[in-house]
Regions:
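Charge-rich, low-complexity N-terminal segments
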Residues: 1-129
Length: 129
């Protein structure tokens, strides 16, 4: 498998929300489930800012950790308690984001799924139970 070699991805992180659209007339959130800027802020804080321009490595991959330790100061490495496959990252991202998805407008929001795309044609998803 090509994946055994050290490599990176330009991930795309997608949250899939479910809830009731606000129907109250005259309020600024009428017709909305949530303001997308709120979702973006949650994803930036709990996913993007954590992994952006970082090398993701499994905590038990001693060979990779050894190689990464020889890199220059300032190299961003995120050590994970799981192998960083798209499938595992989708589960991890779901767990990071789900507690922060709240009912913004009294509409009982839930995080239905989280999708992680490695490429435009390759992705993995983690769904709520």
């Amino acid at each position: 498998s090509k994946c055994r070699h050290m490599h990176g991805h330009r991930y795309r992180w997608e949250a899939e929300l479910e809830g009731d659209v606000v129907t109250k007339r005259g309020v600024s959130e009428e017709g909305m489930l949530i303001d997308f800027s709120e979702v973006s802020e949650i994803l930036n804080t709990h996913i993007h800012d954590v992994v952006d321009h970082a090398f993701l490595v499994y905590e038990d991959d001693k060979l990779a950790l050894g190689a990464l330790s020889m890199m220059e100061t300032g190299h961003r490495t995120v050590i994970l308690p799981f192998i960083p496959t798209a499938e595992n990252l989708a589960k991890w991202a779901f767990e990071q984001v789900e507690p922060h998805i709240t009912s913004s407008y009294g509409n009982s929001l839930i995080l239905n799924a989280f999708h992680v795309r490695e490429t435009p044609k390759s992705w993995a998803s983690w769904f709520s139970k």
